[in-house]
Design a protein with these regions (language model features):
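Core SAM-dependent methyltransferase catalytic element
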Residues: 2-14
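ATP-binding glycine-rich loop module of kinase domains
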Residues: 19-69
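Conserved structural core of kinase catalytic domains
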Residues: 76-123
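Hydrophobic residues embedded in beta-strands of well-ordered beta-sheets
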Residues: 41-42, 90-92, 154-155
Length: 172
């Protein structure tokens, strides 16, 4: 048994949360940071290795594809800006949605309150969104309840990292 401690000295950092996804294949390993500056939050995704740079760059392409695909639907796509570190490696700066709840939280709340009508309304809207212009386009197979943030009537897709060019079946 041993204890471990990390002591950091120096100026305060803007990072309030950091998650390392280094249990993935090297070309998919990333670090996700949430930063806070002047009361405003931002999300950044960095390649954990140079091999993961293409994975980060693909996020910008995915944002464009899904913004076009969901145009006219009731789903917006979270904004992303691809930037570069001084070493030339890319990172994605993504809008942090303040005062939002995930679709998962809303569905869970309906279940806890025995609100079947509310659950059905949310789930039906989700199904319509998932099927929107699905034929022949890139699919996000992680368009799951926790990856949709809800602010009032605005639904926003917050994660478009895991995609495929194969059609996702509507009936399972």
């Amino acid at each position: 048994y041993s204890n471990s401690f990390l002591v950091m000295t120096g100026p305060m950092t803007d990072i309030v949360y950091s998650r390392f996804s280094n249990d993935r294949a090297e070309h998919l390993s990333i670090r996700t940071d949430i930063l806070e500056k002047d009361g405003k939050h931002t999300v950044r995704k960095y390649p954990a290795t140079p091999a993961a740079a293409a994975h980060i760059e693909a996020l910008a392409e995915n944002e464009c594809v899904f913004t076009e695909r969901f145009k006219g639907s009731t789903l917006s796509v979270n904004r992303l800006e691809l930037k570069r570190n001084p070493d030339g490696l890319p990172f994605a700066e993504i809008e942090y949605l303040e005062n939002s709840r995930t679709l998962e939280e809303l569905l869970d709340e309906c279940l806890q309150n025995n609100d079947e009508a509310g659950f059905d309304k949310l789930f039906d809207r989700y199904c319509k969104i998932a099927a929107w212009k699905a034929e022949g386009t890139k699919q996000d197979y992680d368009l799951t309840f926790p990856n949709i943030c809800v602010q009032g009537d605005i639904w926003t897709m917050i994660d478009y990292e895991w995609t495929t060019d194969k059609l996702t079946p509507q009936q399972i």
